[in-house]
Design a protein with these regions (language model features):
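Canonical positions in the second alpha-helix
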Residues: 44, 77-78, 111-112, 215
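Register position in tetratricopeptide repeats
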Residues: 64, 98, 132, 201, ...
Length: 238
C-alpha cells in the first residue's frame, strides 16, 4: 500500500502515481499547524478548483485532524479528477474505516488488491472493515490471501489476523528493540499498530490502548501509518 518500503520495491511503486499528485510528507504537526495547512490549501483550491494535488493534500490534513468525512470528500474529488488512481487510493479506504463506512472500505481494499495483490496491510484493513460490517469470523473467512510480503513482521501480522498466529509471534518477529535503529523502530511501530487494531476487532479495549499507544508514542514514525497510529491514539483517549 505504499506506506513502507524495507527491502522491496513493489510497495513503493504502487503509490508513486499518487505521490506525483501531491501525497505529502506526513509529520507530527500540531492541530493549529494542520488547521493552518487546511486554510492555505483551501485558498489554493478556491484559486484552482481542478488542482488534484491540493485536494489530495487537504484530504490527508483533514484525516490527521480527525475530520474523516471531509477527508473522504477531498479524496473523492481527487479521484474524480484522476479516475485511474482509484485502485491505488488506499488512503481513502482507511478513511472509510474511521468514518464507519465499512462497506465502502471493503470495496476500496478489494479494488486495491487488483494493483497491489501481495500487501498484508491491505488484507488487514479489508479484514477490519469486514469485521465491523459483519463479524470477526466473516472477516477471517474472507481474509485476502497473500503469497509473500517480505517486510518484517508482515507474515506474522497476516497469520495473526488469519487465526493461526499470535501477538507474541508478531513481536518476536519484529526482533529486539533497538532505539537507535530506524528499522527496528519501524518494525515495532507496525507490529504494535496492527496488534492494537486486531484487539479492536475483538473488542479488547485495554489491549487496544496499550498497543496503539506504543505505536503512536514510543515507536512513533513520521510516515502515513505512524500518523494513523497517532490519530487512532487520539480517538481512543478523548
Amino acid at each position: 500500500m505504499g506506506r513502507w518500503v524495507e527491502s522491496r520495491g513493489v510497495l513503493g511503486a504502487t503509490s508513486t502515481l499518487l505521490m506525483a499528485f501531491g501525497l505529502p510528507q506526513v509529520g507530527a504537526d500540531s492541530i493549529p499547524e494542520l488547521q493552518t495547512t487546511v486554510t492555505t490549501l483551501t485558498r489554493h483550491i478556491d484559486e484552482n478548483p481542478d488542482s488534484a494535488s491540493n485536494y489530495q493534500s487537504r484530504g490527508v490534513a483533514y484525516f490527521e485532524l480527525g475530520e474523516f468525512e471531509k477527508s473522504i470528500s477531498d479524496f473523492d474529488r481527487f479521484i474524480q479528477l484522476h479516475p485511474n488512481q482509484e485502485p491505488h487510493h488506499w488512503q481513502r479506504g482507511i478513511a472509510y474505516y474511521y468514518a464507519h463506512e465499512y462497506e465502502k472500505g471493503v470495496q476500496q481494499f478489494e479494488l486495491h488488491k487488483s494493483v497491489n495483490p501481495n500487501d498484508v496491510e491491505n488484507a488487514v484493513w479489508h479484514f477490519l472493515c469486514k469485521a465491523k460490517l459483519e463479524n470477526v469470523q466473516a472477516a477471517r473467512d474472507s481474509l485476502i490471501p497473500i503469497k509473500f510480503d517480505s517486510r518484517i513482521p508482515m507474515v506474522q501480522i497476516w497469520e495473526l489476523f488469519s487465526g493461526i498466529g499470535s501477538p507474541e509471534k508478531v513481536l518476536l518477529a519484529a526482533g529486539p528493540i533497538d532505539t537507535g535503529s530506524g528499522i527496528s523502530r519501524q518494525r515495532h511501530c507496525y507490529a504494535h499498530l496492527y496488534i492494537g487494531l486486531y484487539h479492536e476487532a475483538l473488542g479488547q479495549t485495554k489491549l487496544v490502548k496499550k498497543h496503539i499507544s506504543l505505536a503512536a508514542d514510543e515507536f512513533s514514525m513520521q510516515n502515513y501509518m505512524g500518523m494513523v497510529a497517532r490519530v487512532h491514539n487520539r480517538l481512543i483517549n478523548h
